[in-house]
């Protein structure tokens, strides 16, 4: 027999209603203000129905994280539908940061809300890596390194966008910069291993002079 989820009937407060209010609280005010009292105020009830339905805030948090990841997925998979899917994912990541700054910070910037690194919970990483492999025409460890370098650039732009920094270039300039960085990385990781090692040694020599 299927186990029924608990329902707080008083004031019509249901699990879905609490999850919706908890998600909206995170989306609008960030995880710093995310607590039972604020969620209850938004839902129009006391904190009692929340704990009756969920038992703990950690249980509710898991539901909210899952919903936030769904929003993130929509952005990234939308980017994959562009003419250049891998580049599209980078554009989508920055767009997510700009349009959903508090969700971005809660998921991608700090581990205090999720309790683990974003790389560990990112539901899109498998497909993104496959697109990186196709776009970069590189394999194995090289595609991992290429993607790691691109992530540093794109994440940095995302953090600036989420903070409203005036240093963030407009979309066209950001697009050009992303292309330049990608093409440089692609060319580098297509070089033979010995050539890359030689370049690295030359770089070390220059920095020690």
Question: Would you name each region that the model predicts?
Answer:
Residues 88, 111-140, 144-149, 175-186:
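Amphipathic alpha-helical packing segments from all-alpha helical-bundle domains
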Residues 1-13, 189-209:
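N-terminal intrinsically disordered/low-complexity leader segments
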Residues 34-41, 50:
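Append "Primarily bacterial transcriptional regulators
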Residues 86-108, 116-122, 151-154, 158:
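Helical hydrophobic small-molecule/effector-binding pocket
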Residues 28-31, 44, 51-61:
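HTH DNA-binding helix-turn interface
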Residues 103-106, 151-169, 183-195:
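Amphipathic C-terminal alpha-helical segment
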Residues 62, 66-89, 125-134:
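Amphipathic alpha-helical linker/stalk segments
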Residues 1-29, 37-38, 59-62:
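Basic, helix-initiating cap at the start of DNA-binding domains
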């Amino acid at each position: 027999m299927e186990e029924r989820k608990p329902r707080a009937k008083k004031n019509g407060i249901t699990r879905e209603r609490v999850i919706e209010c908890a998600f909206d609280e995170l989306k609008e005010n960030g995880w710093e203000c995310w607590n039972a009292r604020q969620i209850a105020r938004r839902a129009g009830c006391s904190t009692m129905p929340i704990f009756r339905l969920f038992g703990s805030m950690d249980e509710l948090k898991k539901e909210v994280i899952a919903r936030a990841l769904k929003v993130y997925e929509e952005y990234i998979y939308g980017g994959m539908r562009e003419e250049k899917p891998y580049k599209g994912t980078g554009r989508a990541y920055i767009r997510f940061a700009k349009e959903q700054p508090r969700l971005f910070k809660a998921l991608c910037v700090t581990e205090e809300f999720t309790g683990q690194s974003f790389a560990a919970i990112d539901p899109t990483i498998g497909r993104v890596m496959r697109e990186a492999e196709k776009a970069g025409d590189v394999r194995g460890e090289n595609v991992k390194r290429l993607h790691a370098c691109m992530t540093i650039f794109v994440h940095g732009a995302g953090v600036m966008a989420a903070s409203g920094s005036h240093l963030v270039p407009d979309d066209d300039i950001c697009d050009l910069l992303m292309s330049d960085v990608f093409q440089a990385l692609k060319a580098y990781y297509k070089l033979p291993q010995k050539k890359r090692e030689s370049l690295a040694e030359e770089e070390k020599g220059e920095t020690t002079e």
